[in-house]
């Protein structure tokens, strides 16, 4: 159930990531086909309890950032500082004009935060107003002196590995950062340490072993292999839809209102592009078709906007732990002309689905004046969707459609 707390998230992405090797800042490198920052931001942008996502960037990275997160919802990026601490402070100040109750501070180099982890972070602020996710230390830790000689073996039962997102009451962590800035303290490696410095009691909550920070080239190799193994079930589905023209002054195509001298005869808004995409995604899941989930006999779908149907299909993929790898739609019509609107349609599909625009294709063709599309009696559309799901041997059994 959604929380009543107004929660915002800061995604700290201003670092250069030199230890990760060549290839530019690590947050813009790809892992299993998607950028690290897109993976890091997605869980927060899609979370129902997070009303605002505030990125903090190196201003030189803005073009890379915009390309990586096309279609996501987020506030205008804030410029980062010389240290992580300064960058977080910049993000907090950017949120101050519309101050949330709770702020989650997350490193862009941790691309595997889950909705459940985010929910635990929000709930943990009820304890002391400051909380950090932790996981147990499983290795024996040695404390050494300047020469490298062991001088202590800490009790690992009392040690924890700290992660992000770290969660705070917004007012107290903003005040803590302002105090540190006034006192010239810029040496805190995480926000929990800064909170401790001002006297806050920092609670802990259950982290996630998979929510590891990508730091070295070996980290990228390891996580690439892990994701490939997790999403090894590659599915392809196809969709097809047709609507005849009727009275009206526009048609909806791929979520875009297109002026036209006719409208569609349809139960919903008649968006043939989105309807075909819904069928393609459901087909990849072996999960029925659009009519089985949204029957035209049901009056609640009368005049409904088709973006609802597409979001539903995308959520079905997410519920299976999957990712959409590619979406393609081809419209067959004489008019309206699709070419001038192609990129607008791609951007709209990206906005609805959260899929990167680089993974979305919109095409158009004619039937050379043959058939009903050639006579301009309507529009036909085909679509395909490629979906990656976690491999599950039990899926080899024929269990029928899920409805």
UniProtKB/Swiss-Prot annotation:
PANTHER family: 2-C-METHYL-D-ERYTHRITOL 2,4-CYCLODIPHOSPHATE SYNTHASE, CHLOROPLASTIC. Disulfide bonds: none annotated. GO terms for biological process: isopentenyl diphosphate biosynthetic process, methylerythritol 4-phosphate pathway; terpenoid biosynthetic process. It holds the Pfam family YgbB. Residues 1-234 are annotated as: 2-C-methyl-D-erythritol 4-phosphate cytidylyltransferase. CDD domains: CDP-ME_synthetase, MECDP_synthase. InterPro entries: IspD, IspD/F, IspD/TarI, ISPD_synthase_CS, MECDP_synthase, MECDP_synthase_CS, MECDP_synthase_sf, Nucleotide-diphossugar_trans. One of its GO terms (molecular function) is 2-C-methyl-D-erythritol 2,4-cyclodiphosphate synthase activity. The keyword Lyase applies. It catalyses: 2-C-methyl-D-erythritol 4-phosphate + CTP + H(+) = 4-CDP-2-C-methyl-D-erythritol + diphosphate; 4-CDP-2-C-methyl-D-erythritol 2-phosphate = 2-C-methyl-D-erythritol 2,4-cyclic diphosphate + CMP. This is Bifunctional enzyme IspD/IspF. Its EC number is 2.7.7.60, 4.6.1.12.
């Amino acid at each position: 159930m959604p929380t009543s707390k107004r929660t915002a998230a800061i995604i700290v992405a201003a670092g250069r990531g030199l230890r990760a090797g060549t290839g530019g800042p690590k947050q813009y490198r790809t892992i299993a086909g998607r950028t690290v920052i897109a993976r890091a931001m997605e869980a927060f942008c899609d979370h129902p309890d997070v009303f605002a996502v505030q990125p903090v960037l190196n201003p030189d990275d803005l073009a890379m950032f915009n390309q990586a997160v096309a279609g996501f919802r987020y506030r205008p990026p804030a410029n980062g500082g010389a240290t992580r601490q300064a960058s977080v402070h910049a993000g907090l100040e950017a949120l101050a004009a519309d101050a949330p109750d709770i702020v989650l501070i997350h490193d862009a180099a941790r691309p595997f935060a889950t909705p459940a982890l985010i929910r635990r972070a929000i709930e943990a602020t009820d304890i002391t107003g400051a909380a950090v996710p932790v996981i147990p230390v499983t290795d024996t830790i040695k404390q050494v002196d300047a020469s490298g000689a062991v001088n202590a073996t800490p009790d690992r039962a009392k040690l924890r590995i700290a992660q992000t997102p770290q969660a705070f009451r917004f007012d107290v962590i903003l005040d803590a950062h302002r105090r540190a800035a006034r006192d010239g303290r810029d040496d805190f490696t995480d926000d929990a340490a800064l909170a401790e410095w001002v006297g806050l009691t920092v609670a802990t909550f259950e982290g996630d072993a998979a929510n590891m920070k990508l730091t070295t080239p070996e980290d990228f190799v390891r996580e690439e292999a892990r994701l490939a193994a997790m999403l090894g079930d590659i599915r392809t589905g196809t969709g097809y839809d047709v609507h005849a023209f009727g009275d009206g002054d526009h048609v909806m195509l791929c979520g875009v209102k297109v002026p036209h001298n006719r409208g569609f005869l349809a139960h919903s808004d008649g968006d043939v592009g989105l309807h075909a995409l819904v069928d393609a995604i459901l087909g990849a899941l072996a999960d029925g078709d659009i009519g089985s989930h949204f029957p035209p006999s049901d009056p609640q779908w009368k005049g409904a906007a088709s973006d609802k149907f597409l979001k539903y299909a995308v959520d079905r993929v997410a519920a299976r732990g999957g990712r959409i790898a590619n979406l393609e739609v081809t419209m067959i019509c004489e008019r309206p002309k699709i070419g001038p609107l192609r990129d607008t349609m791609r951007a709209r599909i990206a906005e609805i689905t959260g899929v990167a625009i680089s993974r979305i294709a919109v095409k158009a063709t004619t039937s050379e004046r043959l058939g009903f599309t050639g006579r301009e009696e309507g529009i036909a559309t085909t679509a395909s969707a490629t979906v990656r799901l976690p491999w599950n041997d039990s899926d080899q059994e024929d269990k029928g459609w899920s409805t």
